[in-house]
């Protein structure tokens, strides 16, 4: 009996260690940059809709209520045209405490979106917008809908047992994909579901056409890498969104959902070309090469 008791005691200790390690890891990974920290002494207000818990400073109540309406509209549109949005409440924080135009989304420990309300005035990549709040809320909500997805049995069981663990496969397979995929999908839908968006603008097209003509066009693997060289942080947004635009124009807009579901359902993760073949019938690497050649030929024809 003592041996059995010792076993249970060791298991209990191990369980406590795992829980503590997970807690500390989650805190470390969830630590946001200083610019993203909101003032805790603000006079915050919160309202709830069917799918969102919207928080905002008291003086921005009109904007907060408008953001709630935009979010619900985008939620319905994405559920109809992309994939089914996740259940449960999504936290949406709207703030103007810093002079920055941005937003970010996270799926751990719950689905959360933060929006910086200042509209962009100095970013050429964000020059083609109609309504900043509509564009940025739609973009960040796409991240939630996309990255929350886990269709493989291992992931569903793991999340049921361990909760929303911070990590890619099997918990959140989409978070383990390159940025040209995550940002490309969100940028494509921001353009498809609003009156503007970066796919409809000319800046990203100019970036890629110039790269193709000058022999600097990057393959899709390189497009996710960080570099101080122009176009710096624009790279995954421009390459990703316009490559998906190429794929969906060629193979059909319904293929985006099939691609996301293929990644979310993989038993052996990180096989992007396999997911591409499942969804589009082609290898993404090979199709990316053909796409680059098309852009080169188009650019040269305009230059002649």
Predicted regions and their residues:
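Beta/coil-rich, acidic/histidine-enriched accessory regions frequently appended to metallopeptidases
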Residues: 37-48, 52, 72-73, 231-235, ...
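Short helix/loop segments within enzyme catalytic domains
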Residues: 188-218, 253-261
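Catalytic Zn2+-binding segment of zinc metalloproteases
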Residues: 141-157, 185, 191-203
């Amino acid at each position: 009996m003592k041996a059995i008791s010792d076993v249970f005691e060791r298991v209990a200790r191990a369980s406590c260690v795992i829980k503590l390690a997970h807690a500390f890891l989650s805190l470390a990974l969830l630590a946001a940059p200083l610019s993203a920290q909101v003032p805790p002494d603000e006079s915050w207000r919160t309202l709830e809709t069917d799918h969102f818990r919207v928080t905002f400073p008291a003086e921005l109540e009109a904007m907060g209520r408008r953001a709630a309406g935009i979010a619900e509209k985008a939620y319905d549109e994405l559920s109809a045209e992309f994939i089914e949005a996740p259940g449960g409440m999504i936290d949406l924080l709207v703030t103007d405490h810093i002079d920055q135009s941005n937003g970010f989304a996270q799926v751990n420990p719950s689905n959360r979106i933060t929006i910086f309300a200042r509209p962009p005035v100095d970013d050429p990549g964000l020059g083609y917008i109609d309504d900043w709040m509509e564009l940025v809320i739609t973009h960040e909500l796409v991240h939630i809908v996309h990255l929350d997805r886990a269709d493989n049995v291992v992931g569903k069981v793991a999340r049921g047992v361990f909760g929303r663990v911070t990590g890619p496969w099997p918990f959140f397979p989409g978070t383990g994909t390159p940025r040209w995929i995550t940002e490309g999908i969100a940028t494509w839908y921001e353009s498809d579901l609003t009156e503007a968006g970066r796919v409809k603008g000319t800046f990203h097209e100019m970036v890629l056409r110039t790269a193709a003509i000058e022999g600097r066009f990057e393959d899709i693997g390189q497009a996710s890498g960080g570099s101080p060289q122009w176009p710096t942080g624009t790279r995954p947004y421009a390459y990703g969104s316009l490559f998906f635009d190429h794929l969906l124009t060629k193979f059909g807009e319904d293929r985006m959902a099939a691609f996301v579901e293929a990644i979310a359902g993989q038993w052996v993760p990180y096989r992007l070309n396999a997911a591409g073949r499942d969804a589009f019938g082609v290898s993404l690497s090979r199709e990316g090469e053909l796409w680059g050649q098309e852009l080169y030929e188009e650019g040269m024809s305009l230059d002649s």
